[in-house]
Amino acid sequence: MSNWDDQLDLLIRARTPIIWIRSNEEERVETLLKNSTKRLSPRRLATWDYINGISNILNSNNLGSRQPMAVLEWIKKVDNSSPTILLLKDFHHFCEDPGILRMLKNLTITLRSKPHSIIISSGLWNPSNDLEEDLTILDLPLPIEAEIKTLLSNIAEASNSKLEENVLKELTSACSGLSEARIRKVAARALSQRGQIGKEDLIEVLEEKRQSIARSEVLEYCKTNKSPNDVGGLQILKDWLKQRKQAFSEEAKDFGLPLPKGVLLVGPQGTGKSLVAKAIANSWSMPLLRLDVGRLFAGLVGASEARTRETIQRAEAMAPCIL
């Protein structure tokens, strides 16, 4: 169980009325909540969306209305003997309504004495100032190495595909920075083409990463074939790069050697700053991400904060990388 699972369980046990899980991975959020309800038995999970209404409740699949106000009335009346976690999908679209806003604020008080929690799942939402103090925010990071390894192993096992340990390790590392849905997409493509997942899929993973990063409109995945030999001068930097490359080895990790944090390059245009970044990425065999700061802070209020958060999260998930 991860630290994130521990945080979620703690918030639910503490009877936190409304939790906003910041994530675009709706299916993954629902799976994590299902696992949480198993750990926190006898709690049950109910989900709501505007098309299906309330569903996923044991023996009560047709309860509840499609209307957003009705589902809030429903959770308010659920008996304490049936502790419930209610996942509201796309609910942020309705939170500008004064009635919905008032009802949510009322529920933050009502649910403190009840064993129920409301979960709102959304990646991009700028909550009203009136609701800001009543929300508990829980950021869901992209899948970590252990989750990716388990996911790939399960997919291979389900398809009777043999996955060698060294190949699994390489694919796990390559898939860091991808959402669970995108990892499944790469695996499904591999199984359709060759009937198994293998080392050949590393190229597919890199292409999926490029598409994932391109979607952010802020990060760009850069290809590079430059090396330190293409850079004139800067011998001190080149020596440092050669020496510090060893910090990423297993021996250095076991020894406790800290990873290099960054390099500050200062100079006018045309002096090779971007070239050096490309050379570092190629020399250290790491992905190179280009961040467009102008786009990062352009657009609507609230959107730039969400983009910054997503950008940092994506870069951290792809670590080690050159940004």
Task: Give the predicted meaning of each segment.
Residues M1-D9, R13-T16, R22, E220-K242, ...:
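Dynamic helix-loop-helix/coil hinge segments at AAA+ ATPase domain boundaries and subdomain interfaces
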Residues M1-K38, F94-P98, S274:
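Glycine-rich P-loop/Walker A and Walker A-like loops and their local beta1-loop-alpha1 context
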Residues M1-W4, R66-A70, V167:
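Short linear interaction motifs
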Residues I19, T37, R43-D139, E147-S161, ...:
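Walker A/P-loop NTP-binding motif of AAA+ ATPase domains
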Residues G195, R210-A214, E251-K253:
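Proline-centered turn/helix-capping motifs that create local helix->coil transitions or kinks
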Residues L206-P228:
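Conserved alpha/beta core segments of nucleic-acid transaction machinery
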